[in-house]
Amino acid sequence: MRIVIVGAGKLGYSIAELLSQEEYDIVVIDKEEKQLGNIKENLDVLTIAANGSSPITMDNPDVQGADMLIAVTGSDEVNMVCCILAKKHG
């Protein structure tokens, strides 16, 4: 199962850590390279430095085939847009 997590802050990191231990295929998206660096160093997950609320990001082949999207950015509006885009992109 492929799970996309938008937001690489504390909550996104914790979710990615837990799910990667369960052998899920995890993709973490965040605009901030610094946030992604910590995840790259410590977890066996794919990271994408991009805007999670962009249709271009949702068209990425690593994102398109996802079974689930979890949006945990610091903005409710961004989280909602991410979820709407994910639903539209399948």
What are these regions (language model features)?
Residues 1-90:
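Cytosolic regulatory regions of ion transport systems
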